[in-house]
Regions:
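Conserved G/P- and acidic residue-centered "switch" motifs that form tight phosphate/ATP-binding loops
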Residues: 13, 100, 130, 156
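Conserved acetyl-CoA-binding loop-helix of GNAT-fold acetyltransferases
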Residues: 98-112, 131-139
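A short, well-structured alpha-helix characteristic of acyl/acetyltransferase catalytic modules
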Residues: 1-43, 170-188
Length: 188
């Protein structure tokens, strides 16, 4: 298995982020407005670079020769340290789905949120038709907390939004908690 490296999202990742978000297999499962433009994403990045209520990351694999490949972009948004909660999101390279990358990213983000940020709860939203993601979230300890009916306009139609959450105590019970070996490497 190649080495996995995580670092904060950087400007150099934005072109790839735009390509992934504009991929039908990605935007079909998310409630984002498309097309996503590079100029708009650069503006978003500049506005949010120092925003302390979010933490965006990029996951890479590194082969034996040292070459790096982006495999996922993910993060915690709406970080609320007073109420000790944050929303989680994950986008896997569309060419690399089904390889456990999403699971690794979810586990790493939970570990980061609960260990580093001392969160009480991590939650996320998904659309009902994204059953693959729902299965992943349930396997990693998330619980379906409810369904927000006709909550968002998705691909021209109003659709429900599923709300999943995991509490700190539930995370502490997860067997994978101590097995997640991905480490954050922050350039100095």
């Amino acid at each position: 298995m190649p080495k996995i490296i995580v670092r904060r999202l950087e400007r150099e990742d934005l072109e790839t982020r735009v390509a992934w978000f504009n991929d039908p297999s990605v935007y079909g499962q998310m409630t984002i407005d498309i097309p996503v433009s590079l100029a708009g994403t650069e503006e978003w990045f500049s506005q949010n670079r120092l925003n302390r209520s979010r933490a965006d990351f990029c996951f890479f694999t590194q082969n034996e020769e040292g070459a790096m490949s982006r495999i996922a972009m993910c993060g915690l948004v709406d970080i609320d340290l007073h109420h000790r909660r944050a929303e989680l999101y994950v986008v896997v390279n569309p060419q690399m789905t089904g390889r456990g990358i999403g699971k690794t990213a979810v586990q790493w983000l939970c570990n980061y949120g609960f260990s580093e940020l001392n969160l009480l709860k991590t939650y996320l939203f998904t659309v009902p038709q994204n059953q693959r993601a729902q299965h992943l979230y349930e396997r990693t300890g998330f619980v379906l907390e409810g369904i927000l009916r006709q909550h968002v306009c998705h691909r021209g139609r109003f659709t429900d939004r599923c709300v999943y959450g995991i509490l700190r105590d539930e995370w502490l019970e997860q067997q994978w908690r101590d097995e997640c070996v991905v480490k954050l490497e922050v350039p100095t």
